[in-house]
Amino acid sequence: MLESRRLLNYSGEVLLNTPSQLSLPLSLPDDETFDSFYAGENASLVAAIQTAIHQSHGSYIYFWSRDGGGKSHLLHAACAELSLAGDAVGYVPLDKRAYFVPDVLEGMEHLSLVCIDNVQCIAGDEEWELALFNLYNRVLELGRTCLLITGDRPPRQIDLQLPDLASRLDWGQIYRLQPLSDEEKIQALQLRAKLRGFELPEDVGRFVLKRLDRKMRTLFEMLDELDHASIVAQRKLTIPFVKDILKL
C-alpha cells in the first residue's frame, strides 16, 4: 500500500507527502472564518465549536446538513483560528480521500484540533472506517484533542459497516446545521461583501437570489465574480450591471 503522511502548515494548507516526494496541497479558503460566517439560527452551534476548540480538548462535536450549508466553512474557520494562535491542527476532507490513504489519520490524536469533513464518503470502506474508529478511540484516551466531524445526515443514518464507529459518532454533541432563509442568504452575502470592502444593495441581492441556484457556495462564487467585475469596471453593483455581468 502507498504510504502517506500528512503535514499542515499555518498558512492553511494540508500537504500530503508520498514516498515519491510528491506534495498535494489542499488549500483552505482564507476568507472562511468565524467572522465571515452568517450564523442565522446556528448561533448555538458556532458558540459550541468556539468553546470546544479553545477550552475543551478531548471534546467531540458532530454537525450535519444535507445541502452543504456551511459545514466546511465552520471547519475551515476552526482550523484558521487555532493555527493562527500557533496550535497544531488537521483537516481531512473525506470527499477528496482519493488523495489520501487511511494512514493519514495516524498521530492526529496529538494535534490540538482535528476536523473530519464529509464522513459519509467513507461509508462501506472498511479500511477507512476502521482508521477513523481507531483515531476516535485514541483521541478519547489521550484527551488532548478537539474532534469536529461533519456529515450529510445524523450519524445513525449513515450506512456505516462498522457498528462501533456508528456508535462512537453518535456520542457527544450533535447538531443539525439549519439552512438559511432567503432573507438570511441575502444578509450572508451582504456580510461577505462588507468584509471585502464593497456593498451589495438589498435589491441586487433579491434579484440574484431569484435567478440563480440558491446554494450558498454558488451564491458566494457569484459574489466573487461581481466583486472582480465591479473593480475592473469601477462601478457599484446595480441590477443592470449585474444582469450584464451574469448574462441574466
Swiss-Prot record:
SUPFAM superfamilies: P-loop containing nucleoside triphosphate hydrolases. GO terms for biological process: DNA replication initiation; negative regulation of DNA-templated DNA replication initiation. Pfam families: Bac_DnaA, Hda_lid. It comes from the Bacteria. Mediates the interaction of DNA replication initiator protein DnaA with DNA polymerase subunit beta sliding clamp (dnaN). Stimulates hydrolysis of ATP-DnaA to ADP-DnaA, rendering DnaA inactive for reinitiation, a process called regulatory inhibition of DnaA or RIDA. Belongs to the DnaA family. HdA subfamily. Keywords: DNA replication, DNA replication inhibitor. The active form seems to be an ADP-bound monomer. Forms the RIDA complex (regulatory inactivation of DnaA) of ATP-DnaA, ADP-Hda and the DNA-loaded beta sliding clamp (dnaN). The gene is hda. This is DnaA regulatory inactivator Hda.
